[in-house]
Amino acid sequence: MLATKTDAVPVGAEWSHEVKWDGVRILAEVTDGQVRLWSRNANDVTVAWPDVALPHEALVPGSTRPRDLLVDGEVIALNERGLPDFRVLQDRMHVRRASTATRLAAGLPATYMVFDLLRVDGEDLTGLPLSERRARLAALDLAPWQVPEPYDDGQMLLEATRAQGLEGVVSKRLSSRYTFDARSPHWRKLAHRHRRSYVVGGWRPQEGTSDRLASLLVGEPTADGLVYRGRVGSGIGGKVSRMLTEAVAGLTRASSPFVDEVPRVDAAGTTWVEPVLVIDVDTHGVGYARLRQPSYRGVREDLDPADLEDQS
């Protein structure tokens, strides 16, 4: 069951609200004491997540009989700033060799956040309202899997997740039944867009040209220097492209101004510039090593790079 996008958190006693995790959606099935993990596309991904597909006895301590379960949730891992980050999971997602998966799990442990109970001891719960499924889920001991708490106040959760740099909020109607593979209006998701300022360190032209600016490479000033955060192309075109071309004219330099290595795919064809121009960028979430779905919002002529230290 998938959520539809919304522009506002719904209000009312018929809604419950959860943190929107930046992870990988996984169905976990326990049968005859064995755990199998399934992707949204119904692929068996058990081997990729040995720290999630634990032996059944580890899930239900003291259990004297096999417990039949089917739960829905999200696998997450934390980045260097302590935030759930889909990007850090990418090296693990497609692993098909058990030894490789075990090695990666040791260096980058994952956590399974369970938010729905679909079957227990042979009983199909998908026809029950969410409120009942959630109550049944809360009564189970699934440690070390985690069952995050839902919230009644969606607006409070929206502001809290925004302040903490989390991805957003998912709101669910308490009366909703579970439908596999369906995108439902009874589940709604809202991802935060954050506006922050960054320093331009380079630009790339439109494909097939050498002088039509199409994207900017931007960074964040730190005590160690300008750290690369990503390439911004959305929102740049037409008059904006011409204006930015004029803004970077005369700023060209021979080498990258970033203290860390810019990925080859971003550096290719880049004209490096002196790091003096500041722009505003809208992006999903904060606290990530790279900007997520960034969009250009404008030049900040009132700011210089030193002013951005207060953003951290």
Model-derived features: where do they sit?
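Catalytic cores of nucleic-acid ligases and guanylyltransferases
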Residues: 1-312
